[in-house]
Regions:
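Metal-ion/cofactor- or nucleotide/acyl-coenzyme-handling active-site neighborhoods
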Residues: 1-257
Length: 257
């Protein structure tokens, strides 16, 4: 599929991000490191797309099967409210997103990136927190310093969660709420938030299925396709009727042809 020509503005200035990183490092938190984990190779990533609540029964079935459940940002509180305390919570965003983790619990390991704001770490005091660093070109790497594992990947928390899962040894990913598009009524998240400026995106060429996305969603869809260039041994089951699920459907169809 032809990549879109998109320009997006990343959140946070270089000065803000470096300040956040230095603040996080000063806290002496344990950091994400490569480690073997006992599992069956499957991991479940739950993001905040509008279709996610429709699949809560499937998510609960994964929990009963003993598969790790990862909440991406605001998906945390929905899962907790529905009886699924996530095993991990992952956030890359340098903006304060603590409004999505109001139902903190003692089971979840909270994994904010070092570029997240100090307010996030202050809020998580007393909880199980595992620090990780996101790779980025420029001064952020200087702020992180040498000898640190930095996780590369796309520009969203959801895509970095895939890379973290890969580093931890998982190869089979089930995705919920990775719609990366607006619902027909303009809703972009399960919380009912509406999208701003949007564009139409076609999967499989101009005669393919059309999706409406904001720029960040379209960029995420582009970056998602690059996962397979660097992690060719993964399998992805993207659940729901969204853009990323359609990309996977077309990809699998072409692969089988």
């Amino acid at each position: 599929m032809k990549p879109l020509e998109i320009t997006v503005q990343a959140a946070g200035t270089a000065e803000e991000l470096c300040s956040n990183i230095r603040s996080a490092l000063s806290r002496g938190l344990p950091e994400l490191a490569l480690a073997p984990i006992k599992h069956d190779g499957n991991i479940v990533l739950v993001a905040s797309g509008w279709s996610m609540p429709d699949y809560i029964d499937e998510i609960k079935a994964h929990r009963r099967a003993g598969r790790p459940i990862v909440a991406v940002k605001a998906a945390h509180d929905f899962l907790v409210e529905n009886g699924v305390n996530p095993d991990l919570w992952i956030n890359l965003d340098p903006r304060d997103r603590t409004n999505g983790i109001q139902r903190l619990n003692d089971h979840t390991v909270y994994m904010p990136a070092s570029r997240c704001p100090p307010s996030t770490f202050d809020y998580l005091q007393g909880r199980k927190v595992l620090l990780w660093h996101s790779w980025a070109e420029g001064p952020e790497m200087t702020a992180i310093g040498g000898g640190k594992l930095a996780v590369g990947g796309g520009t969203t928390s959801g895509l970095r969660a895939v890379n973290i899962g890969y580093l931890l040894g998982f190869r089979n990913f089930t995705l919920y709420g990775y719609d990366s598009c607006n619902r027909a009524d303009g809703v972009k998240r399960f919380t009912g938030d509406k999208a701003g400026v949007s564009i139409d995106v076609f999967v499989g060429g101009p005669t393919g299925r059309k999706f409406n996305c904001n720029m960040a969603m379209a960029q995420q869809a582009n970056e998602f396709q690059k996962l397979f260039d660097v992690m060719g041994d993964i399998t992805v089951d993207a659940r729901g009727p969204g853009l990323i699920a359609e990309i996977m459907r077309v990809r699998n169809e072409r692969k089988a042809a």
